[in-house]
Amino acid sequence: MQEETFYSVRMRASMNGSHEDGGKHISGGERLIPFHEMKRTVNSLLEKGLSHSRGKPDFMQIQFEEVHEPIKTIQPLPVRTNEVSSPEEGQKLARLLLEREGVSREVIEKAYQQIISWSGVRGAVLFDIHSGKRIDQTKGKGVRVSRMDWPDANFEKWALRYHVPAHSRIKEALALASKVSRFPAAVAELCWSDDPDYITGYVAGKKMGYQRITALKEYGSEDGCRIFFIDGSEDVNTYIHDLEKQPILIEWEEDHDS
C-alpha cells in the first residue's frame, strides 16, 4: 500500500553546549516525511530551533534517516478544550482527569511530588501506576517519542472542522499523544510545555481522548512536564521501542467521527 519512501527528520537545539555536555535544552522537533518535503522541513526545523523563547542555541543537530519499517496510519484522539482561570484550577482538573482515566490518587500524588526534579528531563518520564515509581532507566534523557507526523493538508482540514487553531504546536502535540496512547501499556499522559510563553497543557488517554487545559503553569516558567502513566505489568521494553521506532502517520477521516 505504501509506495513512497519516508524519512524520519529530527532536530534538537541547546545552549551552553550539547545536551550530553550539560547544555540547556532549547528546542526539539520530529517529522516523518517523503523526500520531496525534505528541504522545506529542514528549514522549518532550523527556524524553530533558532527562534525559540527559551534562548539562543549554540548547539543544534538536524538529522534524517530513511524509514524501513511499514508506516501505520491512525486516527487522531478526539479533542476537548477545557477553559480554566488559573494554573491552580488547571492542575486540579488535570489530577481529576488522570484519576478518571485509571490512575489512583496516591500514584498521582507520588508523581506530582517529583515533577520539579524531572523538569530538566528532555523526553518523557514513564511512571508505573502499580508501583508508583519511575520505571524508565533513561535519567535526564527521558524517552523520546519519534517517527510520527500529521500531513499538513489533513491537519488543516481537521482544525477547520473542529474550530481549533491550525498551529503546528497543536498538530505536533496531538500527533504525539495519539501515538503514545495507542499501545497496550499506555494509561494516561500529562504534559505541559517548557516554553515560557505557552501555558496550555493537556491530559490524554484512550477513554477521554486529548483534553487541552488552557493553563497548567504561570507565564514565564520554563519548567515543563511530560509523564506517561503506564501499566508496568505490560511489556515496557516493547512499549519504549515502539514509541521510539514505530512510524505512525495521523490521518483524520471525517466519517470516522460521525
Swiss-Prot record:
Enzyme Commission number: 6.2.1.14
GO BP field: biotin biosynthetic process
Protein's pathway: Metabolic intermediate metabolism; pimeloyl-CoA biosynthesis; pimeloyl-CoA from pimelate: step 1/1
Entry keyword set: ATP-binding, Biotin biosynthesis, Ligase, Magnesium, Nucleotide-binding
Protein name, UniProt field: 6-carboxyhexanoate--CoA ligase
Pfam families noted in UniProt: BioW (PF03744)
Catalytic activity: heptanedioate + ATP + CoA = 6-carboxyhexanoyl-CoA + AMP + diphosphate
